[in-house]
Curated annotation (Swiss-Prot):
This is Coiled-coil domain-containing protein 42. GO terms for cellular component: centrosome; manchette; perinuclear region of cytoplasm; sperm head-tail coupling apparatus; sperm principal piece. Interacts with ODF1 and ODF2. Interacts with CCDC38. Interacts with CCDC146. Interacts with CFAP53. Pfam families: DUF4200. It comes from the Eukaryota. GO terms for biological process: acrosome assembly; centrosome cycle; cilium assembly; spermatid development. Residues 43-150, 182-236 form a coiled coil. Belongs to the CFAP73 family. PANTHER family: COILED-COIL DOMAIN-CONTAINING PROTEIN 42, COILED-COIL DOMAIN-CONTAINING PROTEIN 42 LIKE-2-LIKE-RELATED.
Length: 316
């Protein structure tokens, strides 16, 4: 709001408090100027002089009022600056909330990806267990076969004599081959078991790390939610304050318009009573008030003189 608007508004309020309804009462109370045309001209000049003194006093008051309005205008400009700062703060905070929402969405996507990876590792672990069970079953079968072969050791010696084996070392070589196969199978089974144990350990560590990350993300989300709630409460509060300021400004603007209309009506009545053409603009409320004040002062002076004259005539 500019200084001119503030000055007109407070000036209207000032004269409304100073005079108020007394303007209309004085206009109704004083007789028509034409009916008092027989007042002594000398006394009228003296009253004019007194009115001039009163006018100078009013000018001093108006200067003091002008200084007060300048101070109020500075305060109003400071409020405007604070309002702009508040808007900038709200805009930055909305941008901050939007960025945090994007971070939260990325965190949720990452958590979903980690859970999917966890399910994949569990499936791999189940598959490794199945392979381990198959290796153990194969190992059991080979052990049974080995025992069966041991039972027929002596039989094999006899078989050498009556079989394709020409020497016993051929049977032993065959036995060593079977032992080597058994060893390879046992080693494969052990490597499979170790692989399963390592996979279990990695899975346990991975699950523990991801549980910690999920807990941290949940704590961060809770903290951001609290900040968002506080910020939303602040936004609602300042929106309410801004609406109140706008409503107050609208009411004061309406009141100022009403006062200007009343001042214009009084000015037109005064101009009609004076029967003089004036060059005062319809928008110049200050000059209108000055002329109204001068007219009221003149009427007051005339009325006082008339009363004195009537009292003197009554005494005579």
């Amino acid at each position: 709001m500019s200084l001119g608007m503030m000055e007109e508004e407070d000036l209207a309020e000032y004269f409304r408090l100073q005079y108020g309804e007394r303007l209309l009462q004085l206009l109704q109370k004083f007789p028509n100027v034409e009916e008092q045309s027989d007042s002594p001209s000398i006394q009228l000049l003296e009253k004019k002089k007194e009115a001039k003194i009163m006018q100078e006093a009013m000018e001093h008051k108006k200067e003091a009022f002008q200084r007060r309005m300048e101070t109020l205008n500075l305060r109003w400009e400071e409020l405007g600056i604070k309002e702009e700062q508040l808007k900038a703060h709200i805009q930055k905070f909305e941008q901050f909330i939007q960025e945090n929402d994007q971070k939260r969405i990325r965190a949720l996507k990452k958590a979903n990806k980690e859970r999917e990876l966890k399910r994949l590792r569990l499936r791999e672990l189940a598959k490794a267990k199945q392979e381990m069970m198959a290796l153990r079953l194969e190992h059991q079968k080979l052990s049974v076969k080995l025992q069966d072969y041991a039972i027929f050791n002596k039989y094999l010696e006899k078989v050498v004599e009556n079989s394709e084996f020409e020497e016993i070392h051929e049977v032993i070589a065959r036995y060593k081959t079977l032992v080597s196969m058994h060893h390879d199978l046992m080693q494969s089974a052990q490597e499979g078991q170790e692989k399963i144990e390592r996979a279990k350990a990695r899975l346990a560590r991975y699950m523990e790390e991801k549980d910690d990350e999920i807990l941290q993300h949940n704590n961060e989300l809770a903290r951001l939610q609290m900040r968002f709630d506080r910020a939303r409460s602040d936004v609602i509060f300042w929106e309410s304050r801004w609406a109140h300021i706008q409503n107050t400004a609208a009411k004061k603007t309406l009141l100022l318009g009403t006062i200007k209309m009343a001042t214009l009506n009084l000015f037109q009545i005064v101009s009609k009573q004076l029967k003089e053409s004036t060059q005062v603009s319809l928008e110049d409320t200050h000059k209108q008030l000055d002329m109204i004040q001068q007219f009221i002062q003149d009427l007051s002076d005339i009325w006082t003189e008339v009363k004195k004259k009537e009292q003197q005539q009554v005494r005579m």
